Amino acid sequence: MTFKGTTIVAVKRDGAVALAGDGQVGLGNGIIVKRDAVKLRRLYKDRVVAGFAGSVADAFALFERFEGKLEESQGNLRRAAVQLAKDWRTDKYLRRLEALLVVADREAVLLISGGGEVIEPDDGIIAVGSGGAFALAAARALARHTALPAVDIAREALQIASQICVHTNDRITVEQV
């Protein structure tokens, strides 16, 4: 039985970074088992926020590993992300994990994947999960055409995604750094 997480969006704007995640957790067969899950974690002395989409158990294993990499690199987000991606790609156990991580501090927003990719979006906005494309489009439109702060853009983008994607709900958690 695999539990799946759904949608995360991150927005960097005017020196602030916000991550938002919906609360829905479902089984692979479309059954909703939890509506108010928290898919965001504060890490490294509350200076880093991380969110996940994909397998819940896999994401927790990756959060733990990433937190260790942050400690080793004394909070250097990029270095910790590259080290996790390298381990994820080369370690026989980690390679089987199915999740995507979005991590952020005040300086950067990064996507880390199991293929060894560490991606920093050009515009400081990224979204993953089943409603990721909807949340990304909404966040970019809001960033271009409003003066809303990062936290409001992230929340509203996820709200919009929840109205379009059946695997994303409107029980939204937001964390800001």
Swiss-Prot record:
What the protein does comes down to: Protease subunit of a proteasome-like degradation complex believed to be a general protein degrading machinery.
Asked whether the keyword Zinc is assigned, the reply is: no
Question: Entry's Gene3D superfamilies?
Answer: Glutamine Phosphoribosylpyrophosphate, subunit 1, domain 1
- Does the record bear Protease in its keywords? yes
Q: How does it assemble?
A: A double ring-shaped homohexamer of HslV is capped on each side by a ring-shaped HslU homohexamer. The assembly of the HslU/HslV complex is dependent on binding of ATP.
EC number, as in UniProt:
3.4.25.2
Where on this chain does Na(+) bind?
A: S162, C165, T168
Q: Which UniProt keywords apply?
A: Allosteric enzyme, Cytoplasm, Hydrolase, Metal-binding, Protease, Sodium, Threonine protease
* HAMAP family reported in the protein's UniProt record: HslV (MF_00248)
Q: Give the taxonomic lineage as stored in the record.
A: Bacteria, Bacillati, Bacillota, Clostridia, Thermoanaerobacterales
The name this protein carries in UniProt is ATP-dependent protease subunit HslV
Q: Name one GO molecular function term.
A: metal ion binding
Q: How is its activity regulated?
A: Allosterically activated by HslU binding.
Similarity-based family = Belongs to the peptidase T1B family. HslV subfamily.
**SUPFAM superfamilies recorded:** N-terminal nucleophile aminohydrolases (Ntn hydrolases)
